[in-house]
Structures are given as structure tokens and as C-alpha cells.
From Swiss-Prot:
One of its GO terms (cellular component) is cytosolic large ribosomal subunit. HAMAP family: Ribosomal_uL14. It comes from the Eukaryota. The lineage of its organism: Eukaryota, Metazoa, Ecdysozoa, Nematoda, Chromadorea. InterPro entries: Ribosomal_uL14, Ribosomal_uL14_CS, Ribosomal_uL14_sf. This is Large ribosomal subunit protein uL14. GO terms for biological process: translation. Transmembrane segments: none annotated. GO terms for molecular function: large ribosomal subunit rRNA binding; structural constituent of ribosome.
Length: 140
């Protein structure tokens, strides 16, 4: 069987600093009713023995909602990282970081469950996930 790829992601993913290991809690930046997301696993990480899989901007991960609407809690969901506090370097040489870690809930195809995103979305994430870019208020 062939691998299905990155869901709804398009374009090439470049290496960035990974700032969100398994067990991290981040803000939910969409209007689904979830307040924060707990990282359970990171999609596409093979890893090494005893090393925690980590997610960075633009990565899809498996999450659960720790605070928010009761119908969203205690379920395993897919999400994508849209902002991270850990500084990373862009291809043009500039470096960027944000004041919070944030993600949005998506389905397996990369389509957002919500209809709006609060705060900026990184350029790297917007290039990879066109459905997220279309709902973003601003792209930084």
C-alpha cells in the first residue's frame, strides 16, 4: 500500500525548529468551541528510541481537547500547528517566533472544522494548508 501523503497539505515542507513535544498543551485558535489542545502524537514522525515526537509550524498532529465544549472533549481529533513560541529560521534568513503556541482542529483531509482563526497564521502553514490559509485573518 502506498502512503497517502500529508492530507490536504500542498507544497514542500522545510526543516524548522520543533517546539511542541508530545504532552504539550496549546491554545485552539479557531471558533469550534475548544479552548486548548493536548498533543497526543505527531503525524509522520518515525523517531528514535526514547525521543519524544515533536511538532512544529505546519505539522499535523493527533490532539484531544482539555478545555472547551463538552461535545469536543474526550475525543481524539486531528489538528495543525499555526503558531509556535520556539524561534525558527525562515528560508530568507529571518527568524520569527510568536507569543503563544496555537493550533486549529482539522479533519483527515486538512479541511478546518471551524470557520475562522483568531490571530496570525504563519506563512509556512498557509503555504502547506490552503484551507487554513483561506480562513486566516492575517498571515505572518
Amino acid at each position: 500500500m502506498s502512503k497517502r501523503g500529508r492530507g490536504g497539505a500542498s507544497g514542500a515542507k522545510f526543516r524548522i525548529s520543533l517546539g511542541l513535544p508530545v504532552g504539550a498543551v496549546m491554545n485552539c485558535a479557531d471558533n469550534t468551541g475548544a479552548k486548548n489542545l493536548f498533543v497526543i502524537a505527531v503525524s509522520g514522525i518515525k523517531g528514535r528510541l526514547n525521543r519524544l515526537p515533536s511538532a512544529g509550524v505546519g505539522d499535523m498532529f493527533v490532539a484531544s481537547v482539555k478545555k472547551g465544549k463538552p461535545e469536543l472533549r474526550k475525543k481524539v481529533l486531528q489538528a495543525v500547528v499555526v503558531r509556535q513560541r520556539k524561534q525558527y529560521r525562515r528560508i530568507d534568513g529571518s527568524s520569527i517566533y510568536f507569543e503563544d503556541n496555537a493550533g486549529v482542529i482539522v479533519n483527515n483531509k486538512g479541511e478546518m472544522k471551524g470557520s475562522a482563526i483568531t490571530g496570525p497564521v504563519t506563512k509556512e502553514c498557509a503555504d502547506l494548508w490552503p484551507r487554513i490559509a483561506s480562513n486566516a485573518g492575517s498571515i505572518a
